Amino acid sequence: AGMVVSIVSHGHGALVQRLLHQLAGASAASITRVVVTHNVPEPELQVPAGGWPFALEIVCNAAPRGFGANHNHALRGAVEPFVCVLNPDVELLAAQEPFAALVRTASEPGVGCAYPLQLDAVGRVQDCERETPSPLALWRRRVLRRHEREVDWVNAACLVLPLPAWQAVRGFDESYFMYCEDVDLCLRLRLGGLRLQRAPARVVHAGQRASGRHWRHLIWHVRSLLRLWCSDVYRRARRLPAAPRGGGRLD
């Protein structure tokens, strides 16, 4: 099954170069096309002597765009059966090719989005599976350090969607900027009767949160949360049945 992968670089040239080599070495059988969007000017990517085993398209923005707008533009007009949103700071584990399992999971009836388990650099499981954010849920997670029991959304570091599901929700809502696009996308998939399904796959993702380090990112995060909480999608999603934590086995 063919898949198009969208990667957005904000000056992450070295990380993108590494990721492309990992995709070429391990996942070429699953991937037919990769679109790399340079959101800011940066040096050209180096092409290996034998070329890439997939079609590589480079988009250079004249002005920076938001997370959702970049991926929507990259995946507009996709004809591949599956689309993948992939962060440049994701690493593939040695001898653990994730995309075959992600595509198989995304192919299951009723699945709107497949995702892998995310680990940090030392192998600890990252909290990519989250409850619908609310002031109370944020208090429990950030202040009380409680683990979330439900999976209402997953972060967009590595998502694989069947093309019909992506088209049905029309991609990301571009009115969000840098934060909550993934929350909104997952809620709209679930409102459409589709489920989020963890695949039996692992990737490494640092999971750095810029909103905890930079005031500008914190402001963007708060604005996006307020937009989410005032949205019709959020209001309707609050009535959805709880989605249990868990997914594909990792043997």
Q: How would you describe each model-predicted region?
A:
Residues 31-41, 57-61:
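Short beta-strand/loop segment that forms part of the nucleotide-sugar
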Residues 184-251:
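Active-site-adjacent helix/loop segment of glycosyltransferases
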Residues 153-170, 174-202:
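A short, conserved alpha-helix in the catalytic core of glycosyltransferases
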Residues 94-126:
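Conserved donor NDP-sugar-binding/catalytic core segment of glycosyltransferases
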Residues 83, 89:
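Short aromatic/hydrophobic "clamp" motif used to bind/position activated sugar donors
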Residues 12-27:
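Short, well-formed alpha-helical segments that are part of the catalytic scaffolds
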Residues 132-152, 156:
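Short, flexible, basic/aromatic active-site loop/helix in glycosyltransferases
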Residues 61-78:
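Glycine-rich, basic loop-to-helix element that forms the pyrophosphate-binding segment
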